[in-house]
């Protein structure tokens, strides 16, 4: 009969084998939550090393506390140094030497037998690390080198956490300069060679790296590299060309940083002016086959006939290498055709055109693929069902045979210096009637008043005097002789609209302004109608209505000042007003 001693919260008791079996069954039948109560009274010798069940999660450890414990002081210090703009540098220090006793080392037989000799107790080995952050130094100790780093980082964290974070200027972008120089924290990510080239590029300085000399045995070479940046020269030495080049850049970079900062300039964005479209697209034909590729058209014809598609074959190539000529053959049923071209595509197209002609289809003329520029030719435009002829002409381009006395001719006005703005139509009879010009409907009953040469000469003289001096002695004389015409103005007239009104009162014609709303350029447009002989029409553009009137009146005054001058212009046969 075996005996086992069990201790569970109660004094120890002796149990027999049958009692042990029944006790185990009762313990297994208890719920799982009762286990912590039985294990709560463990011996005190295990209190320092708690035993955790791997199958059950620990109730004392939460995910937050576990994540916090996983972050080491070195990681926290690196994150803090990035915010402060500092770089931590770890430097290992030699560990402490062991303190061993020299007793009984040089004696053969000591005072004590060797079997009873115990060495002097030796302290554990300690590692030491020196941490430097922004000019401050911290020492850390530990059983391992990593533990020493953690100790030094923890000391640095307690000191650096109290420092305020540097303020970053608002609106500053990465890479932007402050006082002509880039911030040091951005230069930390750049090599010294890159910084040298960047400074030289901004100051227009040439950079040249060259290996000055080599020394040492083949397995231990030493290189000296010289760098010249404008007037600055530096040398660097290293075991390889790369290291010596970097050291040379470091040497010359110290001198380049002493240069005064560059002045900052604000770049003005260039104003992009939209080009006016001077391209007229030719109207396409209503026939869809006119602009179709002959190759595609031939293929569609065969598909519509439900016949076999055309077969193309390259027969030969001839000519010089730079002046090749290809011969392509196309076969449709029993018909064959050939086409030549400078490349295979052109030859294939010509072969398809020839095949279309053989099959009896009309081959359209080649249409220009790109829009054509405006042509300078002035060709007459005829409208079906209308007996009028519209002819464009320019001043000075007289036609001896063009003096026709037909009553069904009507000549459109020529725009001498610029085109009419958007919203203004040329002075055809319908528009002239709408704006109030004394002009009948475009029928064959034209009633044109013959101009008076003497009155035109006087009008031109007054217009010239007003344009050049603002006053007109001729007009003053006319007003003095004719009391009913009006009073003489006191002082010169400065505005062209006032000068034109004064001239109209003296000569007895009317001036009428038509104002239009603002256009897409936020400008006003005014149309002026002068009932002189011949009638004159002009327009003005400006930021306000007064400037529009002045511009239009100035154009009319210039036309009136040229009435008495001989003109080579073609005689006018219609009664349409002149436009400028």
UniProtKB/Swiss-Prot annotation:
Residues where Asymmetric dimethylarginine is found: 108, 115
Disulfide bond sites: none
Chain ranges of the DRBM domain: 72-162, 191-258, 293-361
CC annotations in GO: cytoplasmic stress granule; dendrite cytoplasm; neuronal cell body; plasma membrane; rough endoplasmic reticulum
Positions where Phosphoserine occurs in the chain: 183, 285, 397
Ranges for region Disordered: 34-59, 158-189, 367-404
Start-end of Basic and acidic residues biased regions: 165-182, 373-391
Annotated GO biological process: anterograde dendritic transport of messenger ribonucleoprotein complex; germ cell development; intracellular mRNA localization; protein localization to synapse
Job of this protein: Binds double-stranded RNA (regardless of the sequence) and tubulin. May play a role in specific positioning of mRNAs at given sites in the cell by cross-linking cytoskeletal and RNA components, and in stimulating their translation at the site.
Subunit architecture: Binds tubulin. Binds with low affinity single-stranded RNA or DNA homopolymers. Interacts with CASC3 in an RNA-dependent manner. Identified in a mRNP complex, at least composed of DHX9, DDX3X, ELAVL1, HNRNPU, IGF2BP1, ILF3, PABPC1, PCBP2, PTBP2, STAU1, STAU2, SYNCRIP and YBX1. Interacts with the influenza virus nonstructural protein NS1.
Record's protein name: Double-stranded RNA-binding protein Staufen homolog 1
Organism: Ailuropoda melanoleuca (Giant panda)
